[in-house]
């Protein structure tokens, strides 16, 4: 336990000990004791709460941050899902996408590229009438095109995983940002990936979307250095 945490814990332990008063106390004394108990509980909760990146505030964002974001992903199925979701997120908040994620999964057959690649105008029109997803024709059509491109990449490179992770020699890039505001919207590496995507026929994946995708699949560790996940995912 860090020195600061030890000091706080000492205060909590002392104050909680004061709460154990004998019977017969006045109403004022009981109220003070209740306040001390409340203080103790709040202090303990603060000690137990994980340190997170500053953007993880909403419960959905916290869960995503703690369990998915920045975790190296190598399963083609998940990689394709994030290609679709990140391209859908363009111009919107990630929280909006997370809130619609289950609807996306249902509408896109669990993000099965083989099924999505066969979508025609009828299926696309059905998607555009679905209030649970992002009803943007260009983005929906891009999802179909990207499913077709994914199948092509799997034939050429053996897997979507190989195509993507060879860009960083299969090792995550560990960054050291102290604040999320320091993180760039794109990098030379994401510009290179965007060109690779375009060369293989992918659409709606520019350098900014490509970088968000790289963060999501753990190609780069962009957790803040003060966040517990930074070290847990290979940061020093």
Positions of predicted regions on the chain:
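HhH-family (HhH-GPD) DNA N-glycosylase catalytic core used in base-excision repair
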Residues: 5, 46-236
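A general signal for intrinsically disordered, low-complexity N-terminal leader regions
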Residues: 20, 45-46
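Generic short amphipathic/hydrophobic targeting helices enriched at N-termini
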Residues: 4-8, 33, 44
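Cationic, low-complexity basic patches in intrinsically disordered or flexible, solvent-exposed regions
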Residues: 5, 19-21, 26, 34-36
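Cysteine-centered motifs
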Residues: 16-19, 40
């Amino acid at each position: 336990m860090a020195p600061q945490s030890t000091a706080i814990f000492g205060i909590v332990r002392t104050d909680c000990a004061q709460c154990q008063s004998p019977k017969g106390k006045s109403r004022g004394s009981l109220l003070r004791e209740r306040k001390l108990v409340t203080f103790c509980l709040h202090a303990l909760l603060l000690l137990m709460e994980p340190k997170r990146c500053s953007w993880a505030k909403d419960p959905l964002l916290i869960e995503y941050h703690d369990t998915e974001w920045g975790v190296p992903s190598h399963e083609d199925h998940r990689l394709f899902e994030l290609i679709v979701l990140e391209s859908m997120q363009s111009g919107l908040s990630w929280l909006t996408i997370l809130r619609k994620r289950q609807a996306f999964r249902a509408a896109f057959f669990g993000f099965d590229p083989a099924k999505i690649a066969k979508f025609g105008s009828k299926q696309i029109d059905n998607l555009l009438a679905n209030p649970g997803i992002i009803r943007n024709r260009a983005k929906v059509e891009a999802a179909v095109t990207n499913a077709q491109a994914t199948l092509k990449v799997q034939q050429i490179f053996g897997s979507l995983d190989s195509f993507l992770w060879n860009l960083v020699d299969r090792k995550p890039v560990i960054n050291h940002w102290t604040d999320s505001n320091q993180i760039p919207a794109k990098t030379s590496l994401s510009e290179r990936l965007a060109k690779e995507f375009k060369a293989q026929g992918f659409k709606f994946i520019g350098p900014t979307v490509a970088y968000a995708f790289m963060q999501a699949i753990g190609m780069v560790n962009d957790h803040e250095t003060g966040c517990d996940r930074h070290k847990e995912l290979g940061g020093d």
